[in-house]
């Protein structure tokens, strides 16, 4: 069982979850393997990724009771204001659930065509609060919010976000933002915890990994959870899916934590959100490029390719099938 942390409203959240961003495609077999064989219970997704329907099928067919799962998805900014409830309902229908464990606003930015930006942000958050008050969701949160974005939210929020999900790894650990969230009782969640693998061959990181007889990726994940930061690495590889959960049998020393913290002086942010407003009107899941593999054939409503098709097309499929 993957250990949990506790949100400010006493809701428990697993410290390691499965990320499902649309980059790299969707592999149904990998999702099922993560739940059934590796013990994942936190599934983190977003309307934007275009895989909610596929994940709903996986959760339905995984044989794990819904109440043992922690489903988290996100509101895309085009569904702001009065559209929040409809967007929530659509996500729930696709995920085949009547409630969410966490519902987050994906971005602080709104589309350029919104005239009254601050008023719309306030209305959007109020709709999120109503979902929580009416017990449609167990917690509400935000994603990619800076200190300035949170300050703006605090001007009108009756209920503070239970979490703020941001890019967070040793090369970009946003200590000031995390400390600010800690002061407010907002849990910091991390995405992109391995920096997309760009620096896993770093000499210092590899020395630390050798010391603990762990992989560099496990050291990065341990660095996150040791700060009480739930994190959601994405993988479609069976071995790595399991490896990512084997980070609870050791503890990094204070010296090694400080060494890893020092990597952030390089300020190597991986995810570029600078032009996000120009991309808001693109279709959900546009990065999938049709790479949806292994969804059961009886679910004809979902555009997909089976695992055999993936192999015929020479698509890498490093999962147990």
UniProtKB/Swiss-Prot annotation:
GO terms for cellular component: cytosol. The active site is at residue 49. It is an enzyme of class 1 (oxidoreductase). InterPro entries: AKR, Aldo/ket_reductase_CS, NADP_OxRdtase_dom, NADP_OxRdtase_dom_sf. The record marks 74 as: Lowers pKa of active site Tyr. Substrate binds at residue 106. Keywords: Oxidoreductase. The keyword Oxidoreductase applies. The keyword Oxidoreductase applies. Its EC number is 1.-.-.-. This is Uncharacterized oxidoreductase ZK1290.5. It comes from Caenorhabditis elegans.
């Amino acid at each position: 069982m993957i250990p949990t942390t506790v949100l400010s409203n006493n809701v428990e959240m697993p410290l390691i979850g499965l990320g499902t961003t649309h980059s790299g495609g969707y592999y149904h077999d990998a999702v099922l393997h993560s739940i059934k064989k590796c013990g994942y219970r936190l599934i983190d997704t977003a309307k934007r990724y275009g895989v909610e329907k596929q994940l709903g099928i996986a959760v339905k067919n995984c044989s794990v009771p819904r109440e043992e799962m922690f489903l988290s998805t996100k509101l895309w900014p085009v569904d702001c204001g009065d559209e929040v409830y409809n967007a929530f309902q659509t996500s729930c229908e696709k995920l085949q659930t009547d409630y969410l464990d966490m519902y987050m606003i994906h971005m602080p930015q709104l589309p350029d065509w919104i005239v009254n930006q601050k008023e719309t942000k306030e209305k959007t958050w109020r709709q999120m609060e109503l979902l929580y008050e009416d017990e449609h969701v167990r917690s509400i949160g935000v994603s990619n919010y800076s200190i300035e974005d949170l300050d703006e939210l605090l001007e009108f929020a009756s209920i503070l976000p239970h979490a703020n999900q941001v890019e967070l790894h040793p090369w970009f650990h946003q200590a000031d933002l995390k400390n600010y969230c800690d002061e407010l009782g907002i849990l910091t969640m991390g995405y992109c915890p391995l920096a997309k693998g760009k620096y896993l061959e770093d000499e210092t990181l590899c020395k630390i990994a050798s010391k603990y007889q762990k992989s560099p990726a496990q050291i990065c994940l341990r660095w996150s959870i040791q700060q009480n930061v739930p994190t959601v690495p994405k993988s479609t590889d069976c071995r790595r899916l399991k490896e990512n959960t084997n980070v609870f049998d050791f503890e990094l020393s204070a010296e090694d934590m400080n060494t890893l913290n020092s990597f952030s002086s390089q300020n190597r942010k991986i995810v570029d959100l600078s032009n996000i407003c120009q991309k808001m009107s693109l279709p959900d899941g546009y990065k999938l490029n049709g790479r949806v593999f292994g969804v059961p054939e009886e679910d004809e409503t979902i555009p997909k390719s089976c695992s055999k098709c993936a192999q015929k097309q020479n698509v890498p499929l490093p999962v147990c099938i």
